[in-house]
Amino acid sequence: MILSSGTKKPKVHSSAYVAPTATIAGEVTIGAGCAVLHGAVIVAEGAAVTIGADTVVMENAVLKASGGSVSQFPLQIGSRCIVGPQAYVVGATIGDGCFVASGSKIFNGAKLEDGSGVALGGIVHVNTRLRKGESVPMEHIAFGDPATIYPPEKAPEVHAKMQFFADVFNVEGTQDARARAAATYSKFLRKAHAQDAVLDEHRNVKPPPRRSGEEPPPTQVAEVDKVVDVMMLELEEMEHRRQAAIKRQKGG
């Protein structure tokens, strides 16, 4: 489903594939050769979303930009990136050739330099910068500029260093910050989506006609299979690293 938001509407390259059950709304630009799979949500709320060429957004991933009168958090994703199933990315800048695995979360103002990655369930927090080629291990937390990587049990320490509500919602971190953030965000969202309208157009790329005797071209399904293969290799590599770490601990 493709929706306009006021005068803003998505721009999808003619060679990109958008699944019928994906949702794209507002000032979103999707580059050549991209694949946006079923259930993915890409929404521009007051700031633009830009996705570079040959990037894959997998099932049920949520990509958002956010911007109001006080702060702007556009979302920029480079070329040849993979955003895995159920990943959540908002208001960040992601360079070329990055890998964002299943269930990862990347928050406002974060920056992933070229070739960096976030493994399963990893978090890149507000205003954090991952250096070129750097990786966040499974379920670990990256915070700071440049990033320091923390294990899951250090989450309270990271939280104590952050000013999440001030940075994201412009709300001071007092006792009622959660309630005030909800009220502020609700007002913003109602205004941002008040003029949403479903557009008739839908981008579902069809293969070019073949001449008699020609081999069939690679299909969208084959391309998705390659992406899944890459993700499985990533999982296997992480498991090997985990087992090696366990052996080292036992040996020590």
Q: What is the predicted role of each segment?
A:
Residues 1-9, 45, 53, 58-77, ...:
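Glycine-rich hexapeptide-repeat left-handed beta-helix
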Residues 234-252:
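Intrinsically disordered, compositionally biased tail regions
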Residues 18, 36, 53-57:
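Well-ordered beta-strand segments characteristic of repetitive beta-sheet solenoids
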Residues 82:
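Short HxH-centered metal-ligating active-site micro-motif
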Residues 1-33, 41:
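Extended, small-residue-rich solenoid/repeat segments and analogous flexible loops
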Residues 15-17, 36-37, 79, 100:
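Short Cys/His-rich Zn2+-coordinating modules
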